Structure formats: C-alpha cells, structure tokens
C-alpha cells in the first residue's frame, strides 16, 4: 500500500511541480544523456541534409543505372571493396567502399574497371566505368568469320582455275588434241552447222584426264580416250576416239561423255526452222562425265 501511495504522490508532484517526499529522488543524469544523444542525432541529420550528394541521371539514381549497365554487359560487381592505401577506409571517415566487377571471359568484362576513389562520388565511378568499357571494346578487335556465301574457286568440279596441281603445258597440249578431235567429229558425225563449247571446257577435261592418270605407270600417255555425245537422255552416240600418245601402249581407257545444253534460247526454235535457216547449232553443256576402265589386272 505504501508503494501505491508513493506512485500517486509522484504523479501529482510531476503534474503540479510539488516535491515534498524526500525518500525518493529521481536521477537527472540519464535525462541529460538522452538530451545530448537526441541533440546529436538532430544535429547530424541537419548537417546531413546540407551535404547529401545523390547523382541522378534521367530520373534514376546512378547506382540503378550502374546495375543496369552491368546486367547489359553480363558482368556483376563483386561484394568486396577495393583496397586503397593498405585497405583503409575512404577519405572523410566513410567505411563503405566501391565494388569492382568480377573477372569475366568476355572482352568487355576483361577490362580494368578500377575507378578512382578520391571523393567517393558515384558520378566519378560511373564515368570511369564507361570509359574503361569503351576503351577495352575498341582495343580488342576480333575478325568476323567468312560468310558462307563466299565460296572458294575450287568448289566446282573441274573448275578452270583449279589447275594448280597439274602441269600447265600438259593441260594445254591435251586441250588442243581435244579441240582437233571435236572439229573432226562435227564434220563427220554431227548434222549441224556449228558446235559451241564453253570457254574452259577442254581445259577442265584435260586436267581431269591428267588427274585420273596419275597412278598409272606412264600417266596419260598410256590412255585411249573415247568421246561420246548425249543429245537426249539415254541417247548416246560415239563421235571420236584417239590415243593420247600413239607411240605408247594403252593400258587403260577413259570414256568422255558430253551433253547437249538445252537451257539456251536456240533449243526453243523448232527443228524445221533451223533447217530452213541453216542455223542448226549444238550447244555443249559445261557438265561432263569421265569414266575410267583398266585393261590390266592390278593383282
């Protein structure tokens, strides 16, 4: 009961300013410490309002833009702050350090992104970060792979410019023999006024003959060549044959099949008009077939 009376008296004394009870005295030291702490907090808040520095670009804090740039470049900053001056805190007593990106394998992420720590401004770090990104991208140049449309000159079978592995003089000599045999075949076996050949056809045929004769003891000199003409599908006519070297015994044969090219406009002209105008021309296709037949046993 005594404690309850004291509590009521204390309440009355605090309300009306009366202090007649001497056996209970409140300590004023805790109140003074609380007032000092409150004043210190308010002072720091007021001082902080004057020195608050937040960089905003296009309505977003620089830290948000920095994070988005890291996401766009597939790099993430590490959580450990960089050590400057023996790992001490930043100038001004701050204990928060700037983060540096992790080491990555991409050319952009492999650059050095260490920003200057003087001042501790987010704008300075942002500027240094973007400068390092642009410089590392410009320094590392990777050539683009070749386009699949850029095909090589040797891709087509028997191309005219695919003659590096054969003798040019042998190709020229054998090509002249082929042209002479085709002129004679036109006069004797082909009912036409002229025969047109692709410009590089005889050179390609000669090169293929030489390649197919490489494993033979005497090369192309021991070859007998048969020339056949296919005017229609499954309609083949032999128009010429000759020995490449008459003084060498033939030990293998090659069968050359030429085809008529019907992709030109002259194939659309009726045959009786060709006979009236005497303009019957046979166009030889650039495609040909070369078949080898050995006359001896390899065993």
UniProtKB/Swiss-Prot annotation:
Factors inducing expression: Expression is controlled by homeobox transcription factors. At larval stages, induced by starvation, and mildly by hypoxia in midgut but not fat body.
Gly residues composition bias: residue spans = 84-96
Q: What keywords sit in the KW lines?
A: Apoptosis, Cytoplasm, Developmental protein
Q: Which GO terms describe its cellular component?
A: cytoplasm
Q: Which GO terms describe its biological process?
A: apoptotic process; head involution; negative regulation of growth; negative regulation of signal transduction; regulation of TOR signaling; response to oxidative stress
Q: Which Pfam families match?
A: RTP801_C
Region described as Disordered? 73-103
Using the record for this protein, list the coiled-coil segments as residue ranges, or answer none: none
Query: Which PANTHER family does the annotation name?
Result: DNA-DAMAGE-INDUCIBLE TRANSCRIPT 4 PROTEIN DDIT4, PROTEIN CHARYBDE-RELATED
Q: What function is annotated for this protein?
A: Inhibits cell growth by regulating the Tor pathway upstream of the Tsc1-Tsc2 complex and downstream of Akt1. Acts as a cell death activator during head development.
Its recorded name reads: Protein charybde
What organism, scientifically named, is this protein from?
Answer: Drosophila melanogaster (Fruit fly)
Phylogenetic lineage: Eukaryota, Metazoa, Ecdysozoa, Arthropoda, Hexapoda
């Amino acid at each position: 009961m005594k404690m309850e009376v004291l509590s009521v008296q204390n309440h009355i004394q605090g309300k009306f300013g009366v202090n007649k009870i001497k056996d209970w005295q409140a300590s004023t030291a805790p109140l003074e410490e609380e007032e000092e702490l409150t004043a210190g907090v308010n002072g720091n808040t007021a001082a902080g309002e004057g020195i608050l520095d937040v960089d905003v670009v296009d309505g977003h804090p620089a830290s948000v833009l920095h994070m988005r740039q890291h996401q766009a470049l597939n790099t993430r900053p590490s959580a450990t702050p960089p050590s400057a001056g023996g790992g001490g805190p930043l100038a001004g007593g701050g204990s928060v350090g700037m983060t540096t990106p992790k080491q990555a394998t991409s050319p952009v992420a492999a650059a050095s992104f260490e920003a200057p720590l003087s001042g501790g401004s987010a704008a300075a770090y942002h500027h240094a970060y973007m400068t390092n990104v642009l410089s590392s991208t410009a320094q590392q140049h990777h050539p683009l792979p070749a386009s699949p449309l850029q095909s090589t000159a040797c891709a087509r079978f028997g191309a005219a410019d695919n003659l590096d592995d054969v003798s040019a003089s042998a190709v020229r000599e054998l090509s002249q023999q082929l042209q002479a045999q085709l002129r004679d075949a036109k006069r004797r076996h082909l009912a036409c006024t002229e025969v047109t050949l692709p410009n590089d056809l005889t050179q390609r045929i000669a090169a293929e003959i030489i390649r197919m004769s490489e494993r033979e003891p005497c090369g192309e000199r021991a070859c007998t060549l048969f020339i056949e003409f296919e005017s229609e599908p499954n309609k083949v006519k032999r128009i010429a044959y000759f020995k490449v070297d008459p003084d060498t015994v033939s030990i293998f044969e090659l069968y050359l099949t030429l085809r008529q090219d019907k992709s030109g406009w002259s194939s659309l002209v009726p045959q009786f008009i060709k006979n009236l105008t005497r303009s019957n021309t046979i166009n030889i296709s650039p495609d040909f077939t070369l078949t080898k037949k050995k006359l001896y046993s390899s065993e």
